């Protein structure tokens, strides 16, 4: 028993030593890990501070690993919004428990996730989480609020680029090309129409019918050319053919005998349509009336269309077509000289129908029957049909490589729109179809070369083995192919410069529609299809072209073009990679600002204002200054209560007409006790040593405001004309420079104004001033404070008298030769007449009292 216990004790001691050693090793490793983390954190902090100082902070939305790696190599720090991986949420259902093992596993997964993300770039990203990114690289522009960006922030997109990045926008913009550059869009862009409006549908229908007529002429020429070429073979070659050619000829003759023969009238109608088309191009239809034009009816067009379908699909033939060969050949030569798209039209009249604003080959179909195309456009709901379908002429004679259709993806970069700056990429790649080319089938697998469509299809068994299995070539590989075919110079002389010219033309037209934001750039991808003559035809322009490395070709070129884009748009150094400057618009210098020449410097002259005391005191409202001349005279005047009712002469004076040209008008109906049937009794109140009467209500001529009181000074019953003093007029005129209708406060007045006006009448200027003083209350009638004229007021002895003297201002009675009005004696004013100033009421300019 003892040895066993001893062995157990030794074993336990050895196990304890091993545990201590393991703990020691774990502690050392943890210290090393903590020290390495600390050093890594210091380095990350230093690099982050440098990046913040140099404004090298970027954010990426989308799958752009090449851009991220390239920017990090250049010292940029990425600001991530969600950089931690998702972990299992700690959620417990009601009544359920999570055991310790599950909690331990969740904690371990969280620690492993933190360790995986604990690299230097993630540390730097956490340090700049509160900083503003100065470069935003997104897959779509709508993700970023375009107008909230600062001037220092760069974005890889422009706003309002739908004018050339959508099919409908490019279709409409290309029609305006002749207004910007001397070029014909039909020479590089297949004609295109929108099926959303009736006018566009009618234009498409006319184009389809013209193309149908020219296709009939092509059929006649091609059919006779084939028969002549077969007959022009040497005799020995025909003999070598033997019975095989004889049997094939007999089969063709038997097949032709079974076909439906079409009359030669079909060719005559086609020639007539083509001649009318040429006449329109040469403007021969201007001098021809609309009635003289013999156009086909809809029934005739329908019959011609059905015969054309039978002809091009091999169900019919024209028996005596050889008789029309020379005529058709001459017309085709004329059409080719004016229509550069005659070669790509072919015989089948195939059109490609595309959605107006979709990409990657979605919902694209090819059709060769006009009724089916119009039915497709009419099938949609009218409210959702706006700008949905675009129909474009399909290139029926493309350049083929090993009987397979292909297109070219070409990149270009725009770094500024004002002035327009375009960079063209030297490298491009070709995309092949998986099927052999044929016009007998209108399947999208044959006629669409988009990788988004072809990647789901298998290559045709009968396709040439020279073509790559991944269906892509680089432009360098294509140039080698052309060199082997003996056409090596075509790339540099025709294809490459024509693509550059097409891109430049498209951007010049779209320049006015794009929002030209500084510190922005965008990479675009243009698709071209080559014709048999190696001329490139622009199909569409794509924004945000795919950079996915789907094939070895795209893995190489897409990474290369992204790095070169950063060199041109971000670094702006001398190294621009494979980009070359395609077009830089000349900078238009703004005109020099000449606003300083219009400035006037100096100090205005200040003139001393003389304070002129008012002559008479009449309380009035400021609104009376804007009154217009009266159109109707009041029924009664203001009588003196102490003298009784007005005399008959006063009643006669009320009928006098009002003179014109007086700028002041005061009309106020007097509502007194006499209006209600009683006699008007003046109410006298003593306040501050003055006698005040109830105010006379006055009303503005054109306003509907309630009546306001107008205090009028009450003159004394006796007036001594000898007390009038005459003064020279010149010193007074220098002081009376108040604008007509101006309001200035009287000296010593509080809150009440003085109304001053100069009233022109018969060469005189009268200044009337109204201040606070006494108020009065008149009897029934209207108080007319209409006109203030020199001839209406009492004059001093020896002063001349105007023979055309108007009546009194108050009672409208005629004034005496000198002195105040004898009827009412209720007005006192300053009179300016001739060269003298007559002051009434004594030196204090106040009304006299008895």
From Swiss-Prot:
It is found in: Cytoplasm, Cytoskeleton; Cell projection, Cilium; Cytoplasm, Cytoskeleton, Cilium axoneme; Cytoplasm, Cytoskeleton, Flagellum axoneme. One of its GO terms (molecular function) is protein-glycine ligase activity, initiating. Mg(2+) 1 binds at residues 527, 540. Mg(2+) 2 binds at residues 540, 542. GO terms for biological process: axoneme assembly; flagellated sperm motility; protein polyglycylation; spermatogenesis. Residues 1-29, 228-254, 627-652 are annotated as: Disordered. ATP binds at residues 354, 360-361, 392-395, 405-407, 449-450, 540. Its EC number is 6.3.2.-. Disulfide bonds: none annotated. Monoglycylase which modifies both tubulin and non-tubulin proteins, adding a single glycine to the gamma-carboxyl groups of specific glutamate residues to generate monoglycine side chains within the C-terminal tail of target proteins. Not involved in elongation step of the polyglycylation reaction. Preferentially monoglycylates alpha-tubulin over beta-tubulin. Together with TTLL3, mediates microtubule glycylation of primary and motile cilia, which is essential for their stability and maintenance. Two conserved structural elements specific among monoglycylases, IS1 and IS2, are involved in glycyl chains initiation. Two conserved structural interfaces likely constitute the binding platforms for tubulin tail and microtubule. This is Protein monoglycylase TTLL8. The gene is TTLL8.
């Amino acid at each position: 028993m003892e040895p066993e216990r001893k062995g157990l004790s030794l074993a336990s001691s050895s196990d304890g030593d091993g545990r201590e050693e393991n703990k020691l090793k774990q502690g050392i490793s943890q210290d090393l890990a903590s020290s390495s983390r600390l050093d890594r954190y210091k380095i990350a902090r230093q690099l982050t501070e440098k990046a913040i100082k140099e404004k090298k902070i970027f954010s990426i939305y989308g799958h752009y690993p090449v851009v991220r790696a390239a920017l990090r190599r250049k010292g940029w720090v990425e600001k991530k919004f969600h950089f931690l991986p998702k972990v299992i949420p700690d959620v417990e259902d009601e009544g359920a428990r999570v055991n310790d093992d599950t909690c331990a596993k969740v904690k371990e997964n969280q620690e492993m996730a933190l360790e995986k993300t604990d690299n230097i770039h993630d540390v730097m990203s956490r340090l700049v989480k509160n900083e503003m990114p100065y470069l935003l690289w997104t897959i779509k522009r709508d993700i970023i609020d375009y107008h909230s960006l600062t001037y220092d922030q760069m974005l890889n997109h422009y706003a309002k680029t739908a004018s050339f990045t959508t099919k409908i926008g490019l279709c409409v913009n290309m029609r305006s090309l002749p207004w910007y550059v001397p070029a014909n869009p039909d020479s590089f862009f297949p004609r295109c129409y929108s099926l959303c409006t009736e006018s566009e549908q009618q234009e498409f229908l006319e184009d389809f019918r013209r193309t149908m007529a020219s296709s009939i002429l092509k059929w006649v020429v091609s059919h006779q050319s084939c028969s002549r070429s077969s007959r022009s073979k040497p005799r020995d070659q025909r003999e070598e053919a033997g019975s095989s050619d004889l049997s094939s000829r007999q089969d063709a003759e038997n097949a032709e005998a079974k076909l439906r023969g079409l009359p030669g009238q079909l060719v005559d109608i086609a020639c007539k349509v083509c001649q009318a088309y040429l006449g329109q191009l040469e403007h021969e239809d201007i001098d021809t009336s609309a009635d003289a034009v013999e156009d086909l009816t809809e029934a005739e067009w329908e019959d011609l269309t059905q015969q054309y379908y039978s002809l091009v699909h091999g169900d019919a033939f024209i028996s005596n077509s050889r008789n029309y060969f020379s005529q058709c050949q001459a017309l085709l030569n004329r059409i080719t000289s004016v229509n550069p798209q005659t070669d790509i039209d072919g015989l089948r009249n195939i059109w490609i129908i595309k959605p107006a604003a979709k990409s990657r080959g979605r919902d694209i179909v090819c059709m060769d029957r006009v009724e089916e195309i119009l039915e497709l456009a009419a099938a949609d709901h009218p409210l959702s049909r706006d700008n949905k379908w675009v129909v474009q002429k399909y290139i029926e004679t493309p350049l083929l490589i090993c009987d397979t259709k292909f297109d070219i993806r070409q990149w270009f970069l725009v770094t500024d729109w004002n002035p327009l700056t375009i960079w063209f990429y030297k490298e491009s790649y070709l995309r092949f179809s998986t099927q052999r080319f044929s016009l007998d089938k209108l399947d999208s697998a044959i006629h669409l070369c988009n990788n988004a469509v072809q990647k789901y299809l298998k290559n045709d068994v009968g396709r040439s083995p020279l073509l790559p299995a991944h269906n892509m070539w680089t432009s360098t590989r294509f140039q080698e192919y052309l060199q082997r075919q003996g056409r090596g110079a075509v790339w540099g002389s025709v294809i490459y410069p024509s693509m550059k010219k097409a891109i430049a033309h498209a951007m010049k037209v779209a320049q006015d529609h794009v929002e030209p934001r500084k510190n922005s750039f965008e990479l675009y991808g243009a698709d071209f299809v080559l014709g048999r003559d190696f001329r490139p035809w622009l199909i569409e322009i794509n924004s945000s072209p795919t950079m996915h490395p789907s094939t070895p070709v795209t893995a190489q070129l897409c990474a290369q073009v992204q790095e070169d884009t950063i060199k041109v748009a971000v670094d702006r150094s001398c190294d621009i990679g494979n980009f070359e400057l395609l077009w830089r618009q000349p900078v238009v210098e703004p005109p020099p600002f000449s606003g300083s020449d219009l400035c006037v410097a100096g100090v205005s002259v200040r003139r001393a204002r003389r304070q002129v005391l008012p002559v008479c005191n009449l309380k009035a409202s400021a609104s009376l200054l804007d009154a217009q001349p009266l159109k109707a005279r009041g029924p009664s005047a203001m009588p003196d209560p102490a003298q009784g009712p007005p005399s008959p002469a006063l009643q006669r004076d009320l009928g006098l007409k009002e003179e014109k040209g007086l700028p002041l008008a005061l009309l106020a109906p007097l509502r007194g006790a006499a209006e209600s049937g009683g006699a008007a009794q003046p109410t006298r109140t003593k306040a501050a040593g003055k006698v005040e009467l109830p105010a006379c209500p006055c009303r503005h001529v054109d306003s509907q405001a309630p009546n306001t009181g107008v205090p009028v000074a009450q003159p004394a019953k006796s007036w001594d004309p000898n007390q009038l003093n005459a003064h020279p007029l010149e010193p007074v005129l220098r002081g009376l420079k108040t604008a007509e209708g101006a309001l200035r406060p009287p000296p010593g007045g509080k809150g009440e104004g003085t109304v001053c006006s100069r009233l022109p009448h018969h060469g005189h200027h009268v200044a009337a001033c109204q201040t606070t003083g006494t108020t009065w209350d008149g009897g029934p009638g209207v108080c007319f404070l209409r006109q203030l004229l020199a001839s209406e007021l009492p004059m001093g002895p020896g002063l001349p008298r105007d023979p055309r003297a108007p009546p009194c201002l108050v009672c409208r009675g005629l004034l005496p030769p000198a002195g105040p009005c004898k009827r009412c004696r209720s007005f006192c004013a300053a009179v300016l007449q001739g060269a003298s100033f007559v002051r009434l009421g004594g030196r204090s300019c106040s009304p006299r009292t008895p």
